[in-house]
Amino acid sequence: MVEQRKYKKVYAIEPSSSAIEIAKKIYPDNKNVKYINGFAEEEISKLKLSKPIFFSTMCCLAHLEDEDVLGILKTIDKIAPVDSVLACSEPWGDFYHRECWNIRPPEWWSDTLADWEFEFYNDYILTDPPGRSKGFIAIKK
């Protein structure tokens, strides 16, 4: 994100200290990345934000249970200033749960973040399970 999108500051929250060390070795020159070792719902709540921010989950939330994702989303909602953006490569569609692969319908996301305006994309269709898509953004209103 720093190199391709020219972001001035990226907070990379990761529960695995080993993964952080690997990232630092792969990208040793990324001085604009602040690595934070911890769980998202705990570490996000410590951020002091005064202007809109861009959140990206990549596809991480699909690997977590609903209860954990709810905690993360509620934390984001609590600290995010109006006009903040949440960009997700998360799968969406009919509910589907198996070990480390969880798909939630658009209503689940929009009900959880009621003050956010969502746009779900259909340009990436999943084949496992079929009939689901991947990718959406939301803006806090």
Could you describe each region identified by the protein language model?
Residues 60:
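Hydrophobic adenine-recognition pocket in adenosine-nucleotide-binding enzymes
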Residues 1-47, 64-71, 75, 85-141:
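Class I (Rossmann-like) S-adenosyl-L-methionine-dependent methyltransferase catalytic domain
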Residues 51-52:
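Local beta-strand N-terminus motif with an aromatic residue
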Residues 55-56:
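A conserved beta-strand element that flanks and buttresses the S-adenosyl-L-methionine
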